[in-house]
Amino acid sequence: MELEEVGVEANQPNNDQGSKKQNKNKDKKVKKEKKIGYGGKKSAEENSNFISWLTFSWADRFVVHCFRHVLQLSHIWDLASYDKSAYLAEKIAISWDVEIKKPKPSYIRAAFRAFGLYFVLSWFFYAIYAASQFVGPEILKRMVTFVLKSRSGISTEDPNMGYYYALIMFGSAMIGSVCLYQSNMISARTGDRLRSVIVLDVYRKAIKLSNSARANTSPGEIVNLMSNDAQRMVEVFQLVNNGVFALPQIIVCLALLYRAIGWPTFVGLGLMLAAVPFNGIAAKKLTEIRRHLVGFTDKRVKTTNEILQAIKIIKLYAWEDSFAKKVIERREAEIKLLFSFSRYRAMLIVIVAALPTAVSVLVFSSYYGYYKKLDAGEIFAALSYLNILRLPLGFLPIIVALGIQMKIAAQRVTDFLLLPEMKEISKIEDPSIENGIYIRDATLTWNQEKKEESFTLKNINFEAKGKTLTMIVGSVGSGKSSLIQAMLGEMDVLDGSVAMKGNVAYVPQQAWIINATLKDNILFGSPYDEAKYRKVLEVCALERDIELFPQGDLVEIGERGVNLSGGQKQRVSIARAVYSDSDVYILDDPLSAVDAHVGKHLFHRCFKGILKSKTVILAANQLNYLPFAHNTVVLKAGEISERGSYQQLINAQKEFSGLLQAYGVDESAVNEDVEDDKEIEESDNIVVEEKTKPTEKPKLQNKDGVLTSQEEREEGAVAMWVYWKYITVGGGFLFLMAFIFFLMDTGTRTFVDWWLSHWQNESTKNALAVAQGLEPSGLTDTQYLGIYIGVGMTSILISAGRNFLFFEYTVRASRALHHQLFNALLRAPMSFFDTTPLGRIINRFTRDLDGVDNLMATSISQFLVFFTTVVATLIIISIITPFLLVPLAPICIIFYFLQFFYRYTSRELQRLEAISRSPIFSHFSETLGGVVSIRAYRKKEENILTNQFRLDNNNKCYLTLQAMNQWLGLRLDLLANLVTFFACLFITIDRDTISAANVGLSLSYALSLTGNLNRATLQAADTETKMNSVERITHYIKGPVEALQIVEDHRPAPDWPPHGAITFDNLVMRYREGLDPVLKGISCEIKAKEKIGIVGRTGAGKSSIVLALFRLIEASEGAILIDGENIAKFGLKDLRRNLAIIPQDPVLFSGTLRENIDPFNEKTDDQLWSVLKDIQLHDVAKSLEGGLDSKVTENGDNWSVGQRQLLCLARALLRDPKILVLDEATASVDGHSDSLIQATIREKFSNCTILTIAHRLNTIMDSDRIIVLDAGKISEFDEPWTLLQNPAGLLNWLVEETGPQNAAYLRRLAQAKKDGVNIDQITPPISPTPEQKPFKNADIDNINSPPQQSLKAEDNPNPKALDNSGDNNNNNNNNNNNNNNNNNNNNNNNNNNNNNDNDNDNDNDNSEAGDN
């Protein structure tokens, strides 16, 4: 899995011992790593001595190691104990507990309370650094005076004083550098701690959120908190010291400036004060824009996340353009604000960056105007102070902008952490009370704040206890799933009480699968017990499936269960519950996704067998199982209408009887005898005898069964094409203009300083000439002053142009990259999404895009500024002191190697940091999808620990990267300080010939080199790391793509297809090149308007036919023709828009009801209402506020699953296609609704060619013909009645497996079709009675295997297992897993899957049978 792919397994316990040879190799590797000090060892920093810690020398060997080896996560030291997530979580929890009691809690205050000592320590070091900065200008002034006196011959100082000055300047600079980088490291560590605790607390809170809070907070918004908002903290705290000390530095600089040049200082101060209001206005606007900007970002990420989760449905419906438009609109709104934000930020930078130049020009002009002279010592000391002033002033706008963002981010985090949490269900500890669920006089709602608008359960009295099976039934929207959720504590209790005794296991209606092996999904963190595990596989009918996977139960399932069919996912979910050995089992319609014979097996061997000693609560649509339940609860409109035993309810002749009639069950034929099928039950028991083997940890790793692709990771330097991509994507000419302005800006600033030195030199010469009675030469002082002011003002204008041009460019580039990325993903094939975790993709749209949006501009602009400044500095110093070129050559060589080693290390660390970040988001997305299961299974703490583990792996990359930054910075400062030292040295040697002005200019520039060289190098590295985001985005932009959406030369006619005939011509399909085909030479002809049923066992290829027809997977060989036209020649959009499908998984999107059924707004209101009436949702829609424009929440959570399925039918009705595919289309609705839907399909699609993939055979027995698939081939294809005459046929076997009564009913349906009789007149089967014991003599162990003559094992490989791509039949949740559905008798009713949010109900005790 993801973390293992980048070496995380080195830090986890290895549960798979493997062969001795592997262990020996591993031991050698570990010994080698320990020898060099990496991989699992304690932090090198934590174990270093004081000098090594102070100078970051502990990282030397690591840098060399990174150069020699491709860096892996396992090579990096473990985090220091004080950096680990567990420690940080404990610290912030204590602080937040104090803060939350205050009237206005603040997460930032809590963070300062938790980590305040680190801030103090950081400030201590930074204060020493700040003080050391002022030593240089003082020494510079003395050095100029020393040279002047030496040249004039009146010096009384020690001739060696220049050397002493050089040593003092070097020493003070080195002390400052050491303190600076320690301060930086502590600040970076503190920022990372804050990011970590935000991620930890947001994750912890997300698991605990109440349902009403979750309804108002989308996953995209929460992901933003963990990525963008948390990242803001890191960025601010990296620069916090610059912000804290900016004002003190400015004040000290001004004081020293006043001492040097007197009152002209106040002229500069006045200019600075005049700029304050403008800074304030810009800062206020930035705050306002940023507050709105994060909201638009949240919306964009939320919509993107929703689209990516449902990408398969969008492709099937050819809705890419509609959803692209929605995302682009939200992105454009975001970009509009981003432009505004960038322009105000540019304005703030211009004001602040121009201040040093403007102040210099104004101060020196005033100085000359008042004193009529230029003193070299004072002027260049002042110039050094102004250069020092440049840094805090330059950082001010950055800190202001980041501070604004941090404030907003902190408030968002605080608001989120203050959201209401789910209240734990009352736990009953009284040993005299039996295990079970107890609800008394309860009124419950989904959203307490909007209880009028949300579904409510009223007057609920429910009890399920002891060794009983209680079934909950009701029509679509009656409240079955809601009652199930109420038992789990997921609904708000308005009145009454909900209590529980014992531990709970929960099986949701839509199975939640984690991205791990099948075995891990079943164990779910529980200890491994071989005997119990094997028993669970048997009763959950998983043995045969596991045999077909090449890796067995170690097969990697993939994200969202992509490698399994819908039925397989549900059986894994049931197996997880059974293995947990809980006291109470709450099952929400688990049989809807499985075949009838598998459902039979699960009910009798699992629910009534192995769980017979447990309390089992089962919400279901399969009424044929009701006679076997101890109690039945009937729900209607959110209330319990009846309760009691099956026979009691029949005798009452109330709501239950009407429900049976709606389902088509003949109650009069039901036998009252409800004797238990004891022989079945007694064969199963979850208690494992003590003689079983001791428990052992399961093998978590599987090297062969990897489905999820390893995240791409480039090696070496970021390729030049990535830079070129960024330069050209936003408009190459604009970038070129901005770059030219950068060069002109540095050139004019340098010229201003040089001109001042030249003016001083000429002024001194002219003064000497006048003293000797000679005429002064050259320009007058007034002219020098005019040029000085003119060039200075020009420099300010160029700086403004540079900033506005460059920020304009970066926003354009960001817009283009997003659009290209999103469009590329919309056009990516399904195989890409099946093998790429959603969290990894979302990471591109959050962290990576945020880097391009907000950080790239600052990073590149600062690099260009510092780099050009360093080049200019070296040129100036070398011209003035040519001898400096001698030591400069080796210094440059050392510099080259230092930055080379650093860049190699830092970019690999950055890539590892990015790769190790994705699993955090993947795990988070996975957690949000299964939060109810996590709560029910009491796995909150285990998941929190997993989050901590993944966060620690990410943090050790980040902190090591920060340590590398300080390691390099200190060594670069040493080189820069050596340059200053040698400059002083050569000036001292050459003091009799060099001018004082040149001394001042050289040393003032040399002093600035220390910081500038380091910043230029770090910004170069930072720019490269930011380019990693562009690289990662571009990797997806250049990824695999589907065929063209439109082929202009092959556009179909407007009325295509005219008839709807389909021909499969020797169709061969495989999911990826090199894999075995899943369809093997499919050939058949389907006539226009023909109704075709498609059945087959799991893995037979049913869903693969759908994928091939819609070209989600392209044919490897052969062709599919529609009305004689090869579909391969059409564009995908033209093809898919002319087909229709009702998928098994009903998906709704946030927006309006209208947008969900008519996204292109092509139909009139009357048409929409007419369709809603056809699907029995007219009254429901009318009752909603807004009607057609009523709100649909994310994932359609405010509609039940059954209602969502009906809306999918509405989409097909509106499309009015010639070809319709039904992929188990009525699995999520009750029997009555199923009958209505089938009637609607027969009526409204009578002129359509219909392909029906079915688990429930009653839905296809009225088909004109049935295709029976077996191992990717057509085993049988004929009329239903004809196929049933073959006793050895696969269809005949499947029919027989539904039980005697249902088999007879299915045969009557087939005969009615043959005889032309209306099938609605055929009497459905009655419910089976226990004395029939239909399973008593059944060969349960072979229930999944048809007759040998009709299905050979070697001909039936599981396509999902063979192709670990996840694109398979499996991932479609497709009925792949079992095709004929529902037990013995529920014909239509068997419509299984009624997952309505609202549909839960449950009531158990027979004693209260007559209450209602």
Curated annotation (Swiss-Prot):
Instruction: List the SUPFAM superfamilies hit by this protein, alphabetically.
Output: ABC transporter transmembrane region (SSF90123), P-loop containing nucleoside triphosphate hydrolases (SSF52540)
User: Any idea where the ABC transmembrane type-1 domain is?
Assistant: 119-405, 735-1025
Top-level taxonomic group: Eukaryota
Is Iron given among the entry's keywords?
no
InterPro entries from the xrefs? AAA+_ATPase, ABC1_TM_dom, ABC1_TM_sf, ABC_transporter-like_ATP-bd, ABC_transporter-like_CS, ABC_transporter_C-like, ABCC_6TM_D1, ABCC_6TM_D2
Compositional bias of type Acidic residues: which residue ranges? 1398-1412
Query: TM segments?
Result: 115-135, 161-181, 236-256, 261-281, 346-366, 379-399, 724-744, 787-807, 854-874, 875-895, 967-987
> Which stretches does UniProt call biased (Polar residues)?
1342-1351
The UniProt similarity line reads:
Belongs to the ABC transporter superfamily. ABCC family. Conjugate transporter (TC 3.A.1.208) subfamily.
Q: What is this protein called?
A: ABC transporter C family member 3
> What organism is listed for this UniProt entry?
Dictyostelium discoideum (Social amoeba)
